[in-house]
Curated annotation (Swiss-Prot):
Pfam families on file: Chal_sti_synt_C, Chal_sti_synt_N
Transferase listed as a keyword: yes
Family: Belongs to the thiolase-like superfamily. Chalcone/stilbene synthases family.
InterPro entries documented for this protein: Chalcone/stilbene_synt_C, Chalcone/stilbene_synt_N, Chalcone/stilbene_synthase_AS, Polyketide_synthase_type-III, Thiolase-like
Reaction(s) the record says it catalyses: (E)-4-coumaroyl-CoA + 3 malonyl-CoA + 3 H(+) = 2',4,4',6'-tetrahydroxychalcone + 3 CO2 + 4 CoA
Pathway terms, separated by semicolons: Secondary metabolite biosynthesis; flavonoid biosynthesis
The protein's name: Chalcone synthase 2
Length: 393
């Protein structure tokens, strides 16, 4: 019998078709705060009510945030038990770590269970796990903890992504696409879980970018199942992952930084982040959609990481986008705040549900092609080209 060639083995290993998102699940902590009440609560719990001018500034930030509510694991009771977390820069990493190494995998599990249920296959068919968080670091990591919590096979192939920040919702889809398309039969469980216990701290008039984070960030976890060549009798593709790219924007050093210190994760950003993104976004779009022959940005559906309202406003203006293009993005920002890596997966979920409710022809607001954008530290941009699927076809 002739020996099998490496080329033949390679061909047999690969999937035939493109990777697709097969299911989505999301979860939040039970506790939430309303943005209208948050400035009073925040300055009270951090014992900063004497900083009246700063409080007024923070109120204006919250008013402009376009956020209605945010979910937060940190309750008033937890914060009262951990006064160092409420101070501006007090050593508190141990207390923060003790919370997130337990709660980040737990919240991830809630989202994963929902995604697995929608997928409809036994969890033993999950071949790969990608876990992503910017909330805490530990060994073995959240990927290991989630494997145990869900009862996945010990041979599941795990990837753990720590400290990537807000662009990572795009990164995990890019990685999942490569895994699914290069390993025939692979089913990749992707989980992004974020808890603001690492970044919460009291106010300081010398560090206003920290206050911006306190006004925007919320907690949430999202999970997706990604696979190629779906079993159409059970699996229902939601979005095909057509291409994925990552780039560092020019002249953006130091635009968004986070540093893990004894005081927790500190957050720093330049004022011109919205300008840097809006100035460079069309280049990423042209590179992604040129091969497909698309140059009208209103002819595609949009899943954009909602870093904050200023980013969305400037992107909209720069590209001449119609108001409804960022509806799903703004809806998630309003109801959850900025949940870092989990946001774009929440927006995918919001869009496919709304499309089904409204009787749209496809999961992409009736359109065929779409883009998913992640923006974050670097300044790094992830661009994922999506193709929607017909609803009830």
């Amino acid at each position: 019998m002739a020996a099998v060639t490496v080329e033949e083995i390679r061909k047999a290993q690969r999937a035939d078709g493109p990777a697709a998102v097969l299911a989505i699940g999301t979860a939040t902590p039970a506790n939430y705060v309303t943005q209208a009440d948050y400035p009073d609560y925040y300055f009270r719990i951090t014992k900063s009510e004497h900083m009246t001018e700063l409080k007024e500034k923070f109120k204006r930030m919250c008013d402009k945030s376009m956020i209605r509510k945010r979910y937060m694991y940190l309750t008033e009771d937890i914060l009262k038990e951990n006064p160092n977390m409420c101070a501006y820069m007090a050593p508190s990493l141990d207390a923060r770590q003790d919370i997130v190494v337990v709660e980040v995998p737990k919240l991830g599990k809630e989202a994963a269970v929902k995604a697995i249920k929608e997928w409809g296959q036994p969890k033993s068919k999950i071949t790969h796990l990608i876990f992503c968080t910017t909330s805490g670091v530990d060994m073995p990591g959240c990927d290991y903890q989630l494997t145990k919590l869900l009862g996945l096979r010990p041979s599941v192939k795990r990837f753990m992504m720590y400290q990537q920040g807000c662009f990572a919702g795009g990164t995990v889809l890019r990685l999942a696409k490569d895994l699914a398309e290069n390993n025939r039969g692979a089913r990749v469980l992707v989980v992004c879980s974020e808890i603001t216990a690492v970044t919460f701290r009291g106010p300081a008039d010398t560090h206003l970018d920290s206050l911006v984070g306190q006004a925007l960030f919320g907690d949430g976890a999202a999970a997706v199942i990604v696979g190629a060549d779906p079993n159409e009798s059970i699996e229902r593709p939601l979005y095909q992952l057509v291409s994925a790219a990552q780039t560092i924007l020019p002249d953006s050093d130091g635009a968004i930084d986070g540093h893990l210190r004894e005081v927790g994760l500190t957050f720093h950003l330049l004022k011109d982040v919205p300008g840097l993104i809006s100035k460079n976004i069309e280049k990423s779009l042209k590179e992604a959609f040129g091969p497909i022959g698309i140059s009208d940005w209103n002819s595609i559906f949009w899943i954009a990481h909602p870093g904050g309202p200023a980013i969305l406003d400037q992107v909209e203006a720069k590209l001449g986008l119609k108001e409804e293009k960022l509806r799903a993005t703004r809806q998630v920002l309003s109801e959850y705040g900025n949940m870092s890596s989990a946001c774009v997966l929440f927006i995918l979920d919001e869009m496919r549900k709304k499309c089904a409710e409204e009787g749209r022809a496809t999961t992409g607001e009736g359109l065929d092609w779409g883009v998913l954008f992640g923006f974050g530290p670097g300044l790094t941009v992830e661009t994922v080209v999506l193709r929607s699927v017909p609803i009830n076809a």
